[in-house]
């Protein structure tokens, strides 16, 4: 059977075969490429994927010759190979492909003649072509021999070692033409290759060799130039100056409500994980890693999931006692349903219960209870009903549709779901806003279970917590930390005055919300309609494998991290990162010594806390020890044929893990993020900063990039997390991670004065006419400002020790200016208006634009290096500074 992929209509052929060698023919052929479907010569990637994949590695640098209007390069990316450069004779089709795949930054597109490739020798590990050499053959006298002009240039750009590695196997199996078709390797399309000759002349004329002309420097210079908007003055709007080009080149991908550096890097990490999990030769000595593959494959079994439909959830609801929306239910079982929904299946109706370090005694774990129970992202969506009418209507439609899919009747389902929504609105009314919960000293309340029972008597707390933490034995004297006593008291009163049928509907609705992502496409389609209203996503085209990677990361993230780290993480990165943290910590402590508002006793305690901050880089050590890794997931049963059951088993397993933690001290090996995560965090109860392997990559960090970019990228992230130890919440914890007052009153008053300046500054910023909440974002804004200052001071210290760096070619920036541009370009972002609104009401971070503008307008160093005068938009003349 012929293997043909979906293609556009076949274009007209040239009058003579030799026309295939003429660029004019190809330019004319591809005039409509930007608006047409891909066209595949011979067949698509699936036709030869099985032949090719055994020869590829996730980090191979791949060059695709004569890419044309084919989807091959994108399909290779989706197959788990992110580093792909594509060239074509036609500048018309190259422009079209750049536009079509602008949302995938690791796909690079260049206009080149394959007979004269402009890449340095050894640039690629794999070279692929599908029909390009056929075009060259139209001018050959012998149709079985490719002239040296094509083969030699391919041989030259291949990595020699990589070519030899595969030659012994391939030469015996394939002809010369097939060998080139099978191909072998890439890293780097130099985006400024057109300038290489001129730059080389300049280099030889300059005896100091002050311009860096390495491949890495040329490539990163090209990326920086692509992102800049030179039409905007840096003193007018530095975010637009730094990111205007990036924003033009990065329209929102379908199905996304936001797109930024973090999303892009996570997509790359996911592609690597996909390749690892779908490897047909997968073989591991770790049972946890084998569970990871089984879980992932169960998620991919779409036919099985569709076949089961809604039945798994219907059976579960019947097992719990029924749901008033869909049929008979047990009217006297509120506690039993609550225990099942919140205990066995870990949903969070009314409140959330978890085990974590006691903030006031951080060497021990304790039961903690906090507010919860709302499905929409924020209480604001429920309370401002006029402004959010579309969202509330879409949410009710979603509730009704799911109720109907599970067996509800048209005449009653909407009314019963409306009652559940009204209950959530009442919950929203008593939910405390996030900006009023920032003082942890005020919201922390330790009490016994007996005291909790007196506070919120509508349910039996000892019975509930004993079930939740079984087999542990609890008594009335067991300590519990409650965050928000007023909330729990009012929740208890709300439960008492609500009809049992509405309580049942609400509890089961919480279970339905948690489990429908494991069901068939009808439930996914229903959710997509709600997400379109809530976040502005136009349509979802997320491949199933990406959804399954995310699910696997949630379920078995550290076993998945073991695979990721072994495949990608350079151990030297850990040493380099630790060195950078030391430099940034030293810069922060030096700045502490110059703070005029802080008394000496508080300053000394702050220095001791900074010294005591423990840094965790890359991954926790246990993930590379198979037995230790297996022990972490011991007891979690995973099969390859039931994704829904795997998810139920996960909820039950996580409840057991939580119970197991209560009588144990907190462990430093217990990370809150998996190694592949593109993020970082500070944990006050451990006084530690954590930088997973996933973020120790470009654009945050690359070993052969200028230090200005590394300090402006990962350096600012490090400074940000370190400064969290001293933001409005972190500063309440001492060096041991305990919540206690350690500041002198005079310094505390001065601190609050300085942070009030930050709060007021950010409260003036607006997005689509809506003001930021400077109180809600205060901690992150303090960390952004302090992190930038610490990283820049660390960079200056590095320069004093090592001397000035070479400058990047063509960008026209000093290295000091480059530091600030590098920082800003980390935050280049696009977002729908709906998603922007959601961020304003839920996110403790300021929007990306103001993380740049707010921070840099407070930086004397930035204002000096860019010469921004007082009165310019970037220099109001009033600087807010805490650290």
From Swiss-Prot:
Gene3D superfamilies: Collagenase (Catalytic Domain), Neutral endopeptidase , domain2, Vaccinia Virus protein VP39
Tissue: Isoform EEF1AKMT4-ECE2-1 and isoform EEF1AKMT4-ECE2-2 are expressed in liver, kidney, adrenal gland, testis and endothelial cells.
The UniProt record lists the keyword Protease: yes
Disulphide bridges, residue numbers: 212-217, 235-868, 243-828, 299-548, 757-880
Residue intervals annotated with topology Cytoplasmic: 1-178
Record comment: activity regulation: Inhibited by phosphoramidon.
Chain segments carrying region Methyltransferase-like region: 1-160
Residue spans, topological domain Lumenal: 200-883
Protein name: EEF1AKMT4-ECE2 readthrough transcript protein
Species: Bos taurus (Bovine)
């Amino acid at each position: 059977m012929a293997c043909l992929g979906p293609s556009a209509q076949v274009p007209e052929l040239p009058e003579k075969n030799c026309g295939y060698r003429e660029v004019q023919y190809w330019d004319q052929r591809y005039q409509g490429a930007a608006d047409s479907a891909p066209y595949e010569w011979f067949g698509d990637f699936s036709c030869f994927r099985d032949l090719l994949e055994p020869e590829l590695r996730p980090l191979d640098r791949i060059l695709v010759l004569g890419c044309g209007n084919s989807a091959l390069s994108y399909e290779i990316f989706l197959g788990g190979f992110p580093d792909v450069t594509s060239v074509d004779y036609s500048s018309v089709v190259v422009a079209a492909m750049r536009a079509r795949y602008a949302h995938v930054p690791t796909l690079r597109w260049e206009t080149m003649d394959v007979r004269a490739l402009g890449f340095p020798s050894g640039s690629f590990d794999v070279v692929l072509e599908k029909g390009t050499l056929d075009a060259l053959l139209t001018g050959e006298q012998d149709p079985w021999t490719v002239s040296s002009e094509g083969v030699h240039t391919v041989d030259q750009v291949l990595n020699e070692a990589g070519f030899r590695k595969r030659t012994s196997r391939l030469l015996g199996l394939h002809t010369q033409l097939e060998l080139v078709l099978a191909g072998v390797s890439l890293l780097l399309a130099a985006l400024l290759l057109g300038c290489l000759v001129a730059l080389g002349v300049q280099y030889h004329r300059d005896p100091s060799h002050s311009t860096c002309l390495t491949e890495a420097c040329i490539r990163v210079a090209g990326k920086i130039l692509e992102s800049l908007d030179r039409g905007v003055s840096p003193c007018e709007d530095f975010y637009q100056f730094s990111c205007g080009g990036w924003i033009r080149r990065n329209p929102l991908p379908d199905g996304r409500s936001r797109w930024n550096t973090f999303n892009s890097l996570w997509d790359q990490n996911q592609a690597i994980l996909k390749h690892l999990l779908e490897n047909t030769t997968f073989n591991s000595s770790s049972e946890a890693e084998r569970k990871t593959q089984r879980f992932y494959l169960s998620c991919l079994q779409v036919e099985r999931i569709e076949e089961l439909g809604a039945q798994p959830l219907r059976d579960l609801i019947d097992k719990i006692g029924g749901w008033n929306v869909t049929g008979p239910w047990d009217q006297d079982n509120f506690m039993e349903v609550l225990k099942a929904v919140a205990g066995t299946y870990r949903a969070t109706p009314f409140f959330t219960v978890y085990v974590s370090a006691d903030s006031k005694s951080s060497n021990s774990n304790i039961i903690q209870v906090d507010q919860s129970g709302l499905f929409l992202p924020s209480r604001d969506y429920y309370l401002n009903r006029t402004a959010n009418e579309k969202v509330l209507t879409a949410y009710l439609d979603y509730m009704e549709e799911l109720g109907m899919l599970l067996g509800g009747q048209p005449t009653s389902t909407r009314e019963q779901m409306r009652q559940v929504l009204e209950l959530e609105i009442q919950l929203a009314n008593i939910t405390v806003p996030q900006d009023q919960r920032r003082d942890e000293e005020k919201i922390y309340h330790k009490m016994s279970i007996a005291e909790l029972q007196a506070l919120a008597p509508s349910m039996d707390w000892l019975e509930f917590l004993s079930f939740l933490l079984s087999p542990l034995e609890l008594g009335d004297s067991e300590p519990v930390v409650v965050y928000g006593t007023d909330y729990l008291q009012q929740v208890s009163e709300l439960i008492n005055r609500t009809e049992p049928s509405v309580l049942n509907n609400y509890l089961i609705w919480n279970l339905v919300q948690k489990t429908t992502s494991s069901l068939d496409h009808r439930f996914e389609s229903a959710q997509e309609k709600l997400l379109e209203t809530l976040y502005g996503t136009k349509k979802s085209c997320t491949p199933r494998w990406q959804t399954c990677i995310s699910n696997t990361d949630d379920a078995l993230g550290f076993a998945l991290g073991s695979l990721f780290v072994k495949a990608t993480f350079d151990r030297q990165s850990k040493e380099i990162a630790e060195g950078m943290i030391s430099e940034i910590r030293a810069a922060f402590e030096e700045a502490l010594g110059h703070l005029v508002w802080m008394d000496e006793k508080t300053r000394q305690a702050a220095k001791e806390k900074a010294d005591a901050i423990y840094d965790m880089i890359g991954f926790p050590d246990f993930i590379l020890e198979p037995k230790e890794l297996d022990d972490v997931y011991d007891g979690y049963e995973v099969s390859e044929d039931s994704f829904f059951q795997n998810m139920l088993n996960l909820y039950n397993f996580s409840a057991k893990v939580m119970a197991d933690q209560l009588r144990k001290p907190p462990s430093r090996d217990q990370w809150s993020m998996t190694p592949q995560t593109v993020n970082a965090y500070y944990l006050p109860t451990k006084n530690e900063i954590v930088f997973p392997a996933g973020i120790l990559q470009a654009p945050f960090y690359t070993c052969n990039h200028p230090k200005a970019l590394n300090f402006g990228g990962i350096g600012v992230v490090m400074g940000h997390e370190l400064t969290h130890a001293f933001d409005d919440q972190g500063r309440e914890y001492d060096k041991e991670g305990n919540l206690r007052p350690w500041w002198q009153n005079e310094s505390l008053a001065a601190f609050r004065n300085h942070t009030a300046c930050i709060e007021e500054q950010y409260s003036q910023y607006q997005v689509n006419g809506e003001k930021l909440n400077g109180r809600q974002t205060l901690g992150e804004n303090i960390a952004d400002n302090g992190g930038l200052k610490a990283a820049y001071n660390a960079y200056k210290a590095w320069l004093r020790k090592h001397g000035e760096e070479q400058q990047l070619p063509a960008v026209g920036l000093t290295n000091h200016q480059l530091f600030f541009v590098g920082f800003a370009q980390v935050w280049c972002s696009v977002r729908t208006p709906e998603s922007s609104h959601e961020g304003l009401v839920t996110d403790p971070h300021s929007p990306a634009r103001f993380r740049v503008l707010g921070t840099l307008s407070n930086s004397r160093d930035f204002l000096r290096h860019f010469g921004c005068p007082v009165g310019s938009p970037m220099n109001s003349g009033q600087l807010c500074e805490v650290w």
